[in-house]
Curated annotation (Swiss-Prot):
UniProt cross-references to Pfam families, sorted A to Z: AIRC, ATP-grasp, PurK_C, RS_preATP-grasp-like
Sequence ranges assigned to domain ATP-grasp in this UniProt record: 108-295
Residues annotated as transmembrane: none
Pathway(s) where this gene product acts: Purine metabolism; IMP biosynthesis via de novo pathway; 5-amino-1-(5-phospho-D-ribosyl)imidazole-4-carboxylate from 5-amino-1-(5-phospho-D-ribosyl)imidazole (carboxylase route): step 1/1
Keyword ATP-binding recorded: yes
Name of the gene: ade6
Organism encoding this protein: Schizosaccharomyces pombe (strain 972 / ATCC 24843)
Name under which the protein is recorded: Phosphoribosylaminoimidazole carboxylase
Matching SMART domains: AIRC
Length: 552
């Protein structure tokens, strides 16, 4: 298919390694410019690789003569040398784009021109300008290096004026700028593919968890309302459209504490740590997507979707620690975990904080991903995140609602149970309903008596299915509760069970979950078979002893 295409890759680290893996399947020849025995070269037996620094101008010229196309696995390269060879070989993304993005301040200025939502920032050529920025933005603020900044390196959070000299010294002689500190609730990322003709395609929004300023975990999709995920994808695509050049771009963003505002943090013009999950979770990995984009091969929105509507992924970085055996322990343990795929990068020396590999866990629910992740950590008593919420208006309802919990325990479905009053704690009810989906809940069981507004009000504020349990009160035998819950207006459904029958609510919740959890579907079939057997046993007994001698 691509026998004539020869791709030169500047950089032979783990990103280059995984790019080469994808290239092999597409029959694309790769020539790598980096040190001898770099991770990418270990898995490509070609003899034309160049053993030199990927910033060496002469080596870049030599590479260009052997290839039809140059690309990079890292943005910290010699853009002047790349620009000089563009007359004889294609470079993707363009040297101009790489030059703009590798300088974080230029990147922010560029995006600001196109009205991309960003934190406030300003230049900081000297200590006086940093002090002025502190007065303008307030404390804390973030002092950042314009260049050679990644994985938290090149950033310093300044909490008070006296820390400014220390911060400047810590960041060395590199040019600096100041960014206003934004109180965020979550860090997210979207991988965006840009084709040669400028079309852009977004992978799902992911949630990234940092540890010691290095990406530690990636949840795909992010644990956010779908509307927020879509807005993040739109912002990421809008940002990538402003640049020239094909390839994959990693767009990092913040979700602020209001849960609505999204600001762009920074862009990487290459495969990104937050996109590793795509190897197992999507039809086309970020590495293959990059190659398809720069080589002009077919690509569409289907390539960037999760493989199924129930696919969930959790990517765990394996970082070196003080324990020399840590990496091998995690690697070996991962091989016994269902749905887990191990990627080791071929790095000989394990240093603290060094990326040695990653594990991607795939399952049909985020809770199952979490459970398997705890297996990876060898947690003895793993705590599972709830997928069902059981709520009631008062503790007086507990005697009727506990049967739902009994059923969920029987099916081993994790749940949370609490009191949420529609009338006495309306703010708590609103918060509970609006955050339920993003917290990982998939079904809500709401019990209420009398006016019984709780199920309907919750259903009006969450996209999740709500099961209403009419609770028998002191008057009207619970018929008032039943009538209240079933009389919901069009567009706001509540699945209502019989009065006081929270057991059926629990069973219905399990059936809803079973539509995308095969293991739960099998358990439900077994439950139904067991009920049948109980009835058949009773029928057999009645027929044998007769009605006069029958006792239940």
């Amino acid at each position: 298919m691509s026998e004539k295409q020869v791709v030169g890759i500047l950089g032979g680290g783990q990103l280059g390694r995984m790019m080469v893996e994808a290239a092999h399947r597409l029959n694309i020849k790769c020539i790598i410019l980096d040190a001898a025995n770099s991770p990418a070269k270990q898995i490509d037996g070609g003899r034309e690789h160049i053993d030199a620094s990927f910033t060496d101008p002469d080596a870049i010229v030599e590479l260009s003569k052997k290839c039809t196309l140059l690309t990079t696995e890292i943005e910290h390269i010699n853009t002047d040398a790349l620009a000089a060879v563009t007359k004889s070989v294609a470079v993707e993304p363009s040297p101009a784009t790489l030059r703009c993005i590798q300088d974080k301040y230029l990147q922010k200025q560029h995006l600001q021109v196109f009205k991309i939502a960003l934190p406030e920032f300003c230049d900081a050529p000297d200590q006086e300008s940093v002090e002025k920025a502190g007065q303008e933005f307030g404390y804390p603020f973030v002092l950042k290096s314009k260049t050679l900044a990644y994985d938290g390196r090149g950033n310093y959070v300044v909490h008070q004026p006296s820390e400014i000299p220390t911060a400047i010294k810590a960041l060395g002689d590199r040019p600096l700028y100041v960014e206003k500190f934004v109180p965020f609730s979550m860090e997210i990322a979207v991988m965006v593919v840009r084709s040669l003709d400028g079309k852009v395609y977004a992978y799902p929004t992911t949630e990234t968890i940092q540890k010691d300023n290095v990406c530690h975990l990636v949840y795909a999709p992010a644990r956010l309302p779908f509307s927020i995920q879509q807005r993040a994808q739109t912002l990421a695509m809008d940002a990538v459209r402003t640049f020239e050049g094909a390839g994959i771009y990693g767009v990092e963003m913040f979700v602020l504490q209001d849960g609505e505002t999204i600001l762009l943090n920074e862009i990487a013009p290459r495969p990104h740590n937050s996109g590793h999950y795509t190897i197992e979770a999507c039809p086309t990995s970020q590495f293959e997507a990059h190659l398809r984009a720069i080589c002009g091969l077919p690509f569409s929105e289907i390539n960037t979707q999760l493989s199924t509507s129930t696919t969930h992924a959790l990517m765990v970085n394996i970082l070196g620690t003080d324990d020399p055996d840590y990496v091998s322990k995690i690697a070996k343990r991962s091989l016994s975990i269902p749905g887990a795929t191990l990627h080791l990068y071929g790095k000989a020396e394990s240093r603290k904080g060094r990326k040695m590999g990653h594990v991607t866990i795939i399952s049909d629910s985020p809770q199952e991903c979490e459970r398997r992740y705890q297996m990876l950590l060898d947690v003895k008593d793993p705590v599972e995140s709830p997928v069902v919420g059981i709520i009631m208006g008062s503790d007086s309802d507990l005697s009727k609602m506990k049967d739902a919990a009994v059923i969920l325990d029987e099916f081993k479905v994790p749940y949370e149970l609490t009191i949420v009053s529609a009338h006495r704690t309306p703010d708590r009810m609103v918060t509970y309903a609006r955050t339920a989906a993003s917290r990982g809940l998939r079904v809500i069981i709401a019990g209420a008596g009398g006016a019984a507004h709780l199920p309907g009000m919750v259903a009006a504020m969450t996209p999740l299915p709500v099961i209403g349990v009419p609770v028998k009160g002191s008057t009207l035998d619970g018929v008032d509760s039943l009538h209240s819950i079933v009389q919901m207006p069009r567009g706001v459904p509540v699945a209502t069970v019989a009065i006081n029958n929270s057991q059926n609510a629990g069973i219905l919740a399990c059936r809803i979950l079973a539509t995308f959890q095969p293991s739960l579907l099998a358990a439900m079939e077994s439950f139904m078979d067991n009920m049948k057997e109980i009835v058949l046993e009773k029928a057999d007994k009645l027929e044998k002893v007769g009605w006069k001698n029958y006792s239940a």
